[in-house]
Amino acid sequence: LQGLPGKDGETGAAGPLDPGPVGERGEQGAPGPSGFQGLPGPPGPPGESGKPGDQGVPGEAGAPGLVGPRGERGFPGERGSPGAQGLQGPRGLPGTPGTDGPKGATGPAGPNGAQGPPGLQGMPGERGAAGIAGPKGDRGDVGEKGPEGAPGKDGARGLTGPIGPPGPAGPNGEKGESGPPGPSGAAGARGAPGERGEPGAPGPAGFAGPPGADGQPGAKGEQGEPGQKGDAGAPGPQGPSGAPGPQGPTGVTGPKGARGAQGPPGATGFPGAAGRVGPPGPNGNPGPPGPPGSAGKDGPKGVRGDAGPPGRAGDPGLQGPAGPPGEKGEPGEDGPAGPDGPPGPQGLAGQRGIVGLPGQRGERGFPGLPGPSGEPGKQGAPGSAGDRGPPGPVGPPGLTGPAGEPGREGNPGADGPPGRDGAAGVKGDRGETGPVGAPGAPGAPGAPGPVGPTGKQGDRGETGAQGPMGPSGPAGARGMPGPQGPRGDKGETGEAGERGLKGHRGFTGLQGLPGPPGPSGDQGAAGPAGPSGPRGPPGPVGPSGKDGSNGMPGPIGPPGPRGRSGEPGPAGPPGNPGPPGPPGPPGTGIDMSAFAGLGQTEKGPDPIRYMRADEAAGGLRQHDVEVDATLKSLNNQIESIRSPEGSKKNPARTCRDIKLCHPEWKSGDYWIDPNQGCTLDAIKVFCNMETGETCVYPTPSSIPRKNWWTSKTKDKKHVWFAETINGGFHFSYGDENLSPNTASIQMTFLRLLSTEGSQNVTYHCKNSIAYMDEETGNLKKAILIQGSNDVEIRAEGNSRFTYSVLEDGCTKHTGKWGKTVIEYRSQKTSRLPIVDIAPMDIGGADQEFGVDIGPVCFL
């Protein structure tokens, strides 16, 4: 039977002022079963006319549906372009409340919103700091459908919140991020007009709420731009005519809404706002609802299934980033209303949740305590269609869902009985604009016709004149979410609002520019003495002190490694052949253990040394004399290794070794091999047996006396003999027949085996000053010498780098030859020997010099 229309909903609180940008497209949910009658959506943009279908067979008349219970009025949607009347979709479940977003900057005045349902009275809370958006909580299962009840009472009006201190109008701030849709607040007293805010971004779509009664028809919107061409839906059966609603106030034009995807058409619902008349099509029986997308055959509508069992309640999750959808929890028991907590910090916008199935209407429960936001539940699979349940009692007002996107335009059908799908029709021509039609009477239900295939899409018809409000059709099934529509044009600037309240205190301004310098002040009194300043940088390095005296001799080092075995000595003279003896018994071989003690006379007597032929037990023959001579030669060689004699064949390591082994020997030339190894690279040196010094001769040992350098400049500077003077050379040491590389290696080992070095150089001069200048009394013209590690050794300065003079006979220009003997001693053996010399007082035609290079001695 035809139910009675529900009573009008109350005028809701003013909606949000800031039309936000179009949000991202949500995931497509599975189509749910047909829900109860939802609120009429905003008029959609006119779509192109679908292709006319073939005439279907009349279908059976359906039973009129029951009048749905009264629902709440939703938030006003963004103004879309006027279009043909779209099919009614089911009301979505209410979304979980989002956390408060940060206060947006002042923007232009938004359009008046529709009246929201009255909410529970909350305590006014303090302004909270902006926080992170919590994830969406699980949606509880809808309770079983109860018997139809009387319309519920109006909710109590909320307390008026405290008015903040009036502040100056702030500048337009940047556009804030859009937060998720929040819960419906209590209707407060009308506040002072707010500052104009920037358009905010729309929040994600919430779950569809239970269907409500028809609200007041909205004001007619201005003509919008034509929307995109939508797929044609099959027309539904015509319902009874509803009474037209009173004319609403004209709202401010909002931004153009995004285009939604076409949903499958449902049964004819109550009349919505009058849309623009679509182009007339051929009179065909309405086909069954088709699925969104490309045209195909519709399947038969399934039987409505029973409501599924409620799922278990999910635990509240910590507030954090949006996680994956959780399972649907059971609805909790309604608790007593608690006081509103202070607003939480602004959270980040959570991810858009999956659209769930609309549930059955539950009984009105007590308001529960606000729970923490849970994680979004997983998308449930669509249930099988169940039998229609008895009407339930009027439930409490649900949370206002966000405005749905406009559906695509459907084909206008002639008022006829529902038929089955006809065969696919050919594409029709574009229709002419139709005149304004009068409201048609409800058609008689026809017999069910066979389902025809979907006809081809026709050309878009011309826009018809505004028709009167059509009869209300039953609620259609919720369509699939449409693709993201293009962003609408920005609405016109609204009228200036009244002066706002005083704002919060502004932030401290930036540092001002420095002012002009003031006049100079009077001289102040002398201040107290300041603290001592930081320590200054270190001063330049002072001249080096004199060399310290030689330290005490160190302890005797560990014994060196055992020496190499000596070369075999010369074979002794052959002995006289003895008479042949009688053949003896087989011998047993020589006991080689006798060789083990060779040379170790300190550990016992030499067995060979005290063995005589007459002591042999008959095993030794006459040729044992040769063995004895060989053993003596080996013994002598071992002794020579242990006590080197300094010969070329048996060189010592240093002269100090020769002095230790042979303290009675005299000074003279000996052979040494500091790097050991093969004796072929031994060098001949002079050994001072008084001190144990090893002195290596230079090659050559002198620089001829002549005029080596001629310079026309009066500025005197040091001239290095080897580097600068033509024909000069670095001083080298060792035997002439040894390669310089071999001598250099032996000198390196000799320096490592020594603790001190010394060398003399004699400078022969003719009209050239070598050390002291008798005329000036200073050493500015003294010669420089260079050590083997490239260090320069001077006449004055750091004592570690200065030489001494044993004799100075080159102090003035006499025209005669003189000489100056220079000596340098150092415990830094790497500085010796001397490799170059640099006189300064040369360059004149009468200035000559020569050098005698003494041996370098290491101790």
From Swiss-Prot:
Cystine crosslinks: C655-C687, C695-C857, C765-C810
GO CC, alphabetical: collagen type II trimer; extracellular matrix; extracellular region
Keywords, ordered alphabetically: Calcium, Collagen, Disulfide bond, Extracellular matrix, Glycoprotein, Hydroxylation, Metal-binding, Repeat, Secreted
Chief place of localization: secreted
Modified how: Contains mostly 4-hydroxyproline. Prolines at the third position of the tripeptide repeating unit (G-X-P) are 4-hydroxylated in some or all of the chains. Contains 3-hydroxyproline at a few sites. This modification occurs on the first proline residue in the sequence motif Gly-Pro-Hyp, where Hyp is 4-hydroxyproline.
GO process annotations (BP): collagen fibril organization
UniProt cross-references to Pfam families, sorted A to Z: COLFI, Collagen
InterPro entries from the UniProt entry: Collagen, Collagen_superfamily, Fib_collagen_C
Prodomain residues: 614-859
The keyword Mitochondrion appears for this protein: no
Modified residues (4-hydroxyproline): P31, P40, P43, P46, P280, P286, P292, P553, P559, P574, P577, P580, P583, P586
Gene3D superfamilies from the UniProt entry: 2.60.120.1000
Function: Type II collagen is specific for cartilaginous tissues. It is essential for the normal embryonic development of the skeleton, for linear growth and for the ability of cartilage to resist compressive forces.
UniProt name for this protein: Collagen alpha-1(II) chain
Source species of the chain: Gallus gallus
Gene responsible for this protein: COL2A1
